Amino acid sequence: MTLQISAQNVKALRDKTGAGMMDCKKALEASNGNEEKALDSLRQKGLASANKKSGRTAIEGLLESYIHTGGRIGVLVEVNCETDFVARRPEFQKLAKDIAMQIAACPNVEYVSMMHISDETISLEKRIEAGRDDIKDKPAEMIEKIVEGRIKKRLKELSLLDQMFIRNQDITIEDLINQNIALLGENIKIRRFVRFILGGGEENTKANFADEVADILNKK
């Protein structure tokens, strides 16, 4: 039986760490309500204190580029921080490089986060899913539930922050950024990115392209 975590306990942990409410709730559930263990878990994930910095203005940073081996795919990404001092830190520069290589390995990613996806795009995706042959003859209520699940999965595929980090499949890109916020002590944001494909043709001719990029990452 799952332990019920009270809102007061979640708020108390949030006040101590600055982590998000859902992150605090999940940490408390995973630790069976033990606040000390939950706090350690948040610190290990780099989530403690990250949210306290997330509202601060990030206007410095750098533009990072990555050209994949063979020159078939290129990426340009803007990663922002608060000061030029942090922008020059090797840890920040490594983060920007990792993000650029992540984008190269994720052909479906089109947005920084799900919040950037327009209502028009979401509506279009819903219409496409609702009209698929495998569900169009099902009851309306069932179609709605199936479409909702598929849309949630589709939006995650489009969002960079929701991708699993190719160097460490246990964390997302959002987790990676939060870890670096905790490490460097400044707000960090991905502002924008663009992905170029040579000739504008197929994104990838190899099924294991993500693995190919991951191998390069792991050698660095």
Curated annotation (Swiss-Prot):
<dbReference type="Pfam" id="PF00889">
    <property type="entry name" value="EF_TS"/>
</dbReference>
<comment type="function">
    <text>Associates with the EF-Tu.GDP complex and induces the exchange of GDP to GTP. It remains bound to the aminoacyl-tRNA.EF-Tu.GTP complex up to the GTP hydrolysis stage on the ribosome.</text>
</comment>
<keyword id="KW-0150">Chloroplast</keyword>
<protein>
    <recommendedName>
        <fullName>Elongation factor Ts, chloroplastic</fullName>
    </recommendedName>
</protein>
<dbReference type="GO" id="GO:0009507">
    <property type="term" value="C:chloroplast"/>
</dbReference>
<dbReference type="InterPro" id="IPR018101">
    <property type="entry name" value="Transl_elong_Ts_CS"/>
</dbReference>
<dbReference type="GO" id="GO:0003746">
    <property type="term" value="F:translation elongation factor activity"/>
</dbReference>
<dbReference type="InterPro" id="IPR009060">
    <property type="entry name" value="UBA-like_sf"/>
</dbReference>
<keyword id="KW-0251">Elongation factor</keyword>
<comment type="similarity">
    <text>Belongs to the EF-Ts family.</text>
</comment>
<dbReference type="GO" id="GO:0005739">
    <property type="term" value="C:mitochondrion"/>
</dbReference>
<keyword id="KW-0934">Plastid</keyword>
<keyword id="KW-0648">Protein biosynthesis</keyword>
<dbReference type="InterPro" id="IPR036402">
    <property type="entry name" value="EF-Ts_dimer_sf"/>
</dbReference>
<dbReference type="InterPro" id="IPR014039">
    <property type="entry name" value="Transl_elong_EFTs/EF1B_dimer"/>
</dbReference>
<dbReference type="InterPro" id="IPR001816">
    <property type="entry name" value="Transl_elong_EFTs/EF1B"/>
</dbReference>
